[in-house]
């Protein structure tokens, strides 16, 4: 089986959680199937492609990067995105398309129509719940919202990373068939989250902020952005 993962972000060009998600998903899938990641920000060098975990992977991992067409270098940000999406849609060659974020959703939807390939979308955020983006994109926000809505409403499956996200998806896009929206929680690689030894220098953070390391600690990890809901 061949899977094309479409993503705005992919190593080494990662600035948010969606990029981390796409990287980790691609590595795990590549243990089992042939994966091609189609991402923004231009070609990747061979040494920038993540290694497939495991001793005997049955699949493969390939990364194809795309640049904004030179004719659109000075265009609105949404139009730059669409310029990359058109290139990706033309190149898709897979049994399943898996798109992430609105940046790549239009490419997935166009490829679905062009090639007849089933489209899966993972929701990391939703344009209707980020109205402040109009400050950044102007009328381009209407374009990004349109692209996301059309892609979601025509996807064969939409993955929500939580029950709350599923509710938001159905609220934002009431025309979407609820049976197509499923919850798949984010996972972690447990070996990367082992409790450090007592002499690990990382414990100095607890000392610096006077945190009792013997008590449970609630930690938030995320970008400082309005959509995260932190009022400080």
Q: What kind of region is each of these model predictions?
A:
Residues 194-211:
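A short helix/loop element that forms part of the nucleotide-sugar donor recognition site in Leloir-type
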Residues 97-98, 153-163:
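A short beta-strand/loop micro-motif in the catalytic core of glycosyltransferases
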């Amino acid at each position: 089986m061949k899977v094309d993962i479409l993503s705005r972000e992919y190593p080494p060009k990662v600035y948010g959680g969606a990029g981390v998600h796409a990287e980790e998903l691609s590595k795990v899938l590549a243990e089992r199937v042939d994966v091609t990641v189609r991402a923004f920000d231009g070609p990747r060098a061979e040494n920038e492609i993540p290694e497939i975990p495991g001793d005997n992977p049955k699949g493969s991992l390939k990364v194809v990067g795309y640049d904004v067409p030179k004719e659109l270098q000075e265009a609105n940000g949404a139009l730059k995105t669409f310029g990359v999406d058109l290139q990706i849609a033309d190149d898709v060659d897979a049994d399943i398309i898996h798109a992430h974020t609105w940046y790549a959703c239009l490419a997935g939807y166009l490829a679905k129509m062009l090639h007849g390939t089933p489209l899966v979308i993972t929701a990391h955020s939703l344009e209707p719940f980020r109205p402040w983006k109009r400050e950044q994109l102007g009328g381009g926000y209407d374009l990004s919202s349109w692209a996301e809505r059309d892609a979601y409403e025509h996807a064969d499956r939409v993955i929500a990373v939580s029950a709350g996200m599923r509710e938001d998806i159905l609220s934002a896009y009431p025309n979407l068939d609820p049976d197509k929206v499923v919850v798949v929680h984010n996972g972690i690689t447990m070996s990367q989250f082992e409790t450090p030894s007592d002499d690990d220098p990382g414990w100095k953070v607890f000392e610096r902020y006077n945190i009792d390391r013997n008590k449970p600690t609630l930690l938030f990890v995320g970008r400082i952005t309005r959509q995260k809901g932190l009022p400080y």
